[in-house]
Amino acid sequence: MNAGSTTTPLPRTPELIAQAYAAMSDQEAERIQAGFAAAAARPVTLRANALKTTPDEVAEKLTERGIPFERVPWYEDAFVLGDGVREKTVWELELYQEGKVYLQSLSSMLPPLALAARDGADVLDMCAAPGGKTSQIAALTGGTAHITACEMSAPRAEKLAYNLSKLGVHGVNIMRADARRLDEFFSFDHILLDAPCTGTGTFRLGDDRAENRMTGKLLAKTARSQRALLDRALTVLKPGGTLLYSTCSILPEENGEQVAAALRRHRDCSIVPLAVQQAGVADDDAKPLPASTRALAGAFEDGSIPTLKSAVEGTVTVCPSQRFEGFYLALIKKQ
């Protein structure tokens, strides 16, 4: 928080978050503080897998089991379960065991919606495990996208393959590779880069171990990785293609500063303001965007998804809250 602030600091706040507060207005720091406190009561959320079911079927099955839920107006496949419902309850459902639903936070559902991959497009998920966003891209494109999913960790690649199979996602090219070293032979219409980060947006008040995880050493490591991943992504992105960069961080070093620096290095790339999509047409070919993407832009505008001021105009910083983890999204287009 700013010097001279009288706001009580968040108890046992990791140093990285405290440093971020120092660069913010008191109002924004207080909103984030409140979000971290409310996160302790964050409800379980899940996504209906459109490759295997419909939102209405999921609603019907949840009702039959007496599980309270709320639908999300900006994404028909998203469900917020009632107070007291735990993940264990979902694990026991046939819906879950059959791959008809996937446990996924609301914030992590945002990147595939913002990317808005076209049906039949060549899509790269650069850091794909455990597969939630990969499978969501497949569902949003009706299984027509040609998806390449990168994961350099063998155990995580196995988990990715298992989840995609369970969710009915077929034909994905899983590459056991470091996405920072992808050959320039490859090229993609759309790229999702949900980059490794400090995870500061996921902090919850009372997490005493976060101080040991969220360190300056980790930030230095993730920032180097993010830079390399962004450079490689913008290299293998086709002209006219789009890259969605995201993190679950509230730190400018991982968000706006990374994106601004990448745009300086890649002069043929520019930001596509996410709220512009509310008009319902893509800026390159005037074809209507999916209704879910238009609804997402509207939710950013009307406050249904709480946001903070972003340093790079047109990008979105989701404020931590009871329902949302702190998250950052930037949509970049290559000329």
Protein language model annotation of sequence segments:
Residues 1-335:
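S-adenosylmethionine
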